[in-house]
Amino acid sequence: FVPLLVSKLVCVVTKKC
C-alpha cells in the first residue's frame, strides 16, 4: 500500500490536482 500512489490516483480520477 502506497499512500502517495493512492493520492495521485485520486487526484487524477477526481481531476482535482
Swiss-Prot record:
Taxon lineage: Eukaryota, Metazoa, Chordata, Craniata, Vertebrata
Tagged with keyword Disulfide bond: yes
One cellular-component annotation, GO: extracellular region
GO biological process: defense response to bacterium
Family: Belongs to the frog skin active peptide (FSAP) family. Brevinin subfamily.
Stretches assigned to coiled coil: none
Protein known as: Brevinin-1AVb
Organ and tissue specificity: Expressed by the skin glands.
Principal location: secreted
